[in-house]
Amino acid sequence: MQRWFYSTNHKDIGTLYFIFGAWAGMVGTSLSMLIRAELGQPGSLIGDEQVYNVIVTAHAFIMIFFMVMPILIGGFGNWLVPIMLGAPDMAFPRLNNLSFWMLPPSLTLLLASSMVESGAGTGWTVYPPLSSAIAHAGPSVDLAIFSLHLAGVSSILGAVNFITTIINMRPQSMSIDRMPLFVWAVGITAVLLLLSLPVLAGAITMLLTDRNLNTSFFDPAGGGDPILYQHLFWFFGHPEVYILILPGFGMVSHIISQESGKKEAFGTLGMIYAMLAIGILGFVVWAHHMFTVGMDVDTRAYFTAATMIIAIPTGIKIFSWIGTLHGTRLTMTPSMLWALGFVFLFTVGGLTGVVLSNSSIDIVLHDTYYVVAHFHYVLSMGAVFAIMAGFVHWFPLMTGLSMNQFLLKVHFFIMFLGVNLTFFPQHFLGLAGMPRRYADYPDTYASWNVISSLGSVMSMIATLMFIFCIWEAMIAKRINIFSLNLSSSVEWNHPHPPADHSYEEITMISTF
């Protein structure tokens, strides 16, 4: 009890984040299955469009704030950053504990918002006037706002902790450009969180006062403007999607360089600059989510151009990963499969992103399933594949146990087929004009929706199989005798699992 509730150990807190993220991920997956069941055939299954929208909203919030962020930043970040830096722990261990323990109440508030009155059926963007007191009477949206506040404070505190750790707790000889790529990725992610979340907090606080205190920030009747909310929200929302993917970039860099038998990734400095560029550019492209609100043509031209420029540093990363793989004998280990799947599918998602960055095309494709397909390719096959890659790669280090390699490979192929079958047809639906966030659709769209829903069942089966893989590893207790690879990074020089206090004295790194 003492160990888990009052923990100040970065490994224990990281493990808590993993367990919480896995639990939330199962809730989020269940919600996505409800969505695909509703859309599996024309006509109504749930029977109430408000309930459908509540499910969609909760699915998005849970997957983003309670699955991807806790696992990538909280789980892998806590576990690996101090060990990779040679630091005894995080800079603020008790703050670290507080950051975690704000998430369960936050999730509770979000689930409560779905269960009172008619729920928050606003979509994850929570746009007014739909989220106003008139269209959404009752406490649902207010509870969702408080949930976001808590999750946001948790992330900001975590970000401060990571930034301080990375700046202050490096060994003397580790200059900033020699830090491991994953540490860089988490550091940039933390800066993005620190700069973007306060803007979201401001926006939803104004929405809260609009709903309850009779202000009119977003109500035209009182001189407000709903477009202001969209600008504030997307100024957070766009950096947020890079927050979700950057730690994945860092992990994939480590996995590919290690599994390729290279001592470092190709173009390490270029990789760092690319991540920095993505982080900076992520803040100046937010209005590409709003091409349909009636902006000037020159504004749209700027946001189109700026969005396309992000493709350049992203391309640098893709080609550097391919460069790292060059000349190696590819060993198809499970972690390598996930990393290769990540690179390929993230590239596909990035290409549809370049399509959508054209404002003229986006006006037609906005709010269709093409957009859904695009961001699920980069999230459901980018962030999630990175999580899976990192998990199967570092599981032996974190637990000291090895998983069944054959089962993991089978799981990868089922999952790969499942997610592609789910989301690839949605490109066609979007091009055919099927809009997002509707519980029903004309019969014309039936065939691709049936295939999409079949794919979601496959992914669900794959998820169950992965839970079995973890159970099997825990039960079989195949203890690691030695590492499968030569260590590409300092964390593999530790015992499996590492000691409670990884570094008893200050480390000295002479050379890499």
Swiss-Prot record:
UniProt keyword Thylakoid, yes or no = no
Keywords of the record, alphabetical order, are: Calcium, Copper, Electron transport, Heme, Iron, Magnesium, Membrane, Metal-binding, Mitochondrion, Mitochondrion inner membrane, Respiratory chain, Translocase, Transmembrane, Transmembrane helix, Transport
For the ligand (Fe(II)-heme a), the binding residues are 59, 376
DNA-binding as a keyword?
Answer: no
> What does the Swiss-Prot or TrEMBL cofactor note state?
Binds 2 heme A groups non-covalently per subunit.
What are the EC numbers? 7.1.1.9
Q: Where is the 1'-histidyl-3'-tyrosine (His-Tyr) crosslink found in the sequence?
A: 238-242
Binding, O2: 242
User: What residues bind Mg(2+), as annotated?
Assistant: 366-367
**Catalytic activity line of the entry:** 4 Fe(II)-[cytochrome c] + O2 + 8 H(+)(in) = 4 Fe(III)-[cytochrome c] + 2 H2O + 4 H(+)(out)
Q: Which domain of life is it from?
A: Eukaryota
| Compartments in which it is found | Mitochondrion inner membrane
What topology does the record note for this protein and the membrane?
Answer: Multi-pass membrane protein
The positions annotated for binding Cu cation are 238, 288-289
Q: List the Gene Ontology MF annotations in alphabetical order.
A: cytochrome-c oxidase activity; heme binding; metal ion binding
Q: Which Pfam families match?
A: COX1
What does it do? Component of the cytochrome c oxidase, the last enzyme in the mitochondrial electron transport chain which drives oxidative phosphorylation. The respiratory chain contains 3 multisubunit complexes succinate dehydrogenase (complex II, CII), ubiquinol-cytochrome c oxidoreductase (cytochrome b-c1 complex, complex III, CIII) and cytochrome c oxidase (complex IV, CIV), that cooperate to transfer electrons derived from NADH and succinate to molecular oxygen, creating an electrochemical gradient over the inner membrane that drives transmembrane transport and the ATP synthase.
Name this polypeptide is given: Cytochrome c oxidase subunit 1
Q: What gene is this protein a product of? A: COI
